[in-house]
Amino acid sequence: IGVSPDTGFLRDSGINLGERGHILVDDSMQTNIEGVYAVGDAIMVKDYLHRTDVAIPLAGPANRQGRIAADNIAGLGRTYKGSLGTSILKIFSMAAASTGNNERNLQRMGKEYRVLYIHPNSHASYYPGATPLTLKIIFSENGDIYGAQAIGYKGVDKRIDIISTAIKGNLKVWDLQEIE
């Protein structure tokens, strides 16, 4: 997303850092040093779909990581399952959002994929105020949803939230046509 971790102060601490300086943690948010936890923008996490190491400096995942680290410090034994990196950006009255992997990430991983572009209205066209939006869905040959991007004036957040939920619920791309 374009940020770098400010972890230089940890270089001689014994805490393992990734090649770009991110703190390496396990799925309990613990570093390689027992009892030392890290969360947020400075850590490397697992991509939810492909289990690869990724940096996702977003508030939502950071909050979840903080709760998981606190629970583990308290002995509750919770695990972080990774992140889809779901995010939204508003530019004046237009919104752009994404979830999961984009084409560039999939190409870097050597994954084969298909892309579907659709241009629905934000809601039923017979109801006043409908506006067009563009939705791009990326999926595998067998229908696994890898990611999506959307842009428009209304309804972008709803579409991306539904798709991120579909990914976490292991729905296939063709299951989306049945969602009401």
Over which residues does each language-model region extend?
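Beta-strand scaffold of nucleotide-dependent catalytic cores
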Residues: D26, Y146-A150, I160-I163
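FAD-site-proximal beta/loop scaffold in flavoenzymes
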Residues: I1-I68
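A short, polar/charged loop-to-alpha-helix boundary motif
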Residues: K154-L171
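Cysteine/selenocysteine-centered motifs that mediate thiol-based redox chemistry or coordinate metal-sulfur cofactors
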Residues: G169-E180
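Generic alpha-helical structural context detector
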Residues: G60, D71, S164-T165, E178
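Mid-to-C-terminal Rossmann-like scaffold of FAD/NAD(P)H-dependent oxidoreductases
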Residues: A42-K154
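Residue-level detector of anion-binding/catalytic polar loops
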Residues: N16, E112, K172-V173
